[in-house]
C-alpha cells in the first residue's frame, strides 16, 4: 500500500468502521459503503469523509468520481454487514486486492462471479482474525487511534447476567456489542 491509496469498504458495521479508521491512520483513503444511513452517519462521526449509500447513489459512478477514475486499489468486504459482494469487481481497479474480513459462522456460501475476478486479475485474500496483533490493538486503542464511541449497544451489570443474557439472545441482531460491567 502507498499513502493516498483508496480503500472501498463494503459495510459500515463496527469492523468496517474500525477498518476505515485504520486506513486513515495509515494515510489511506477509505470509502465506506452501506445501505444503513444510521451506520453511515456513525462512520462520518468517526471521521470517515467518503460514505456511499447504494440506495441513493450509483456506487461505481461515485467511486469513479472520488478516485478520479482510478477505482479503489483495495476493497474490504465484511460478510456480516448485509452488503452484497456483487459490487467488488465494479469498484476495484484491475490488479487490485480484495480482502474478505471478519468471520461469520452463518456464512456458508459467498457468491462472487469468478469470471469478473479473473477478468480484472483481482487478488483475493481473507483475514479472519488479528492473532498476534493484540499489543498493537491495545496501543491503537490507548492512543485513541480507534474511536469506539457508538459501538456499544448495551451495558449490563455482572450480577444481572443471568437475567439479561436470555433476553439479549432472543434477538441476537438487536444487540451489536454488549459490555459486562464487572465493577
Language model region names:
Residues 15, 19, 39, 63, ...:
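Aromatic/hydrophobic pocket-lining residues that form π-stacking "cages" and hydrophobic walls in ligand
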Residues 36, 104, 130:
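Residues in the short beta-alpha loop(s) of Rossmann-like NAD(P)-binding domains
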Residues 86-90, 131-183:
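C-terminal hydrophobic helical "lid"/dimerization subdomain
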Residues 121, 127-130:
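E1/E1-like adenylate-forming module used to activate ubiquitin-like modifiers
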Amino acid at each position: 500500500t502507498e499513502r493516498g491509496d483508496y480503500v472501498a469498504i463494503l459495510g459500515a458495521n463496527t469492523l468496517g468502521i474500525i477498518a476505515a479508521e485504520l486506513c486513515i491512520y495509515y494515510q489511506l483513503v477509505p470509502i465506506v459503503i452501506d445501505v444503513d444511513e444510521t451506520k453511515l452517519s456513525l462512520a462520518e462521526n468517526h471521521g470517515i469523509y467518503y460514505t456511499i449509500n447504494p440506495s441513493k447513489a450509483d456506487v461505481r459512478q461515485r467511486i469513479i468520481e472520488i478516485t478520479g477514475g482510478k477505482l479503489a486499489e483495495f476493497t474490504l468486504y465484511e460478510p456480516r454487514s448485509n452488503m452484497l459482494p456483487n459490487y467488488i469487481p465494479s469498484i476495484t481497479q484491475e490488479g487490485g486486492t480484495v480482502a474478505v474480513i471478519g468471520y461469520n459462522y452463518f456464512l456458508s456460501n459467498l457468491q462472487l462471479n469468478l469470471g469478473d475476478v479473473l477478468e480484472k486479475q483481482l487478488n483475493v485474500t481473507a483475514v479472519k482474525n488479528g492473532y498476534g496483533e493484540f499489543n498493537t490493538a491495545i496501543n491503537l486503542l490507548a492512543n485513541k487511534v480507534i474511536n469506539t464511541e457508538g459501538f456499544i449497544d448495551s451495558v449490563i451489570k455482572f450480577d444481572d447476567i443471568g437475567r439479561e443474557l436470555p433476553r439479549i439472545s432472543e434477538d441476537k441482531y438487536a444487540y451489536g456489542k454488549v459490555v459486562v460491567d464487572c465493577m
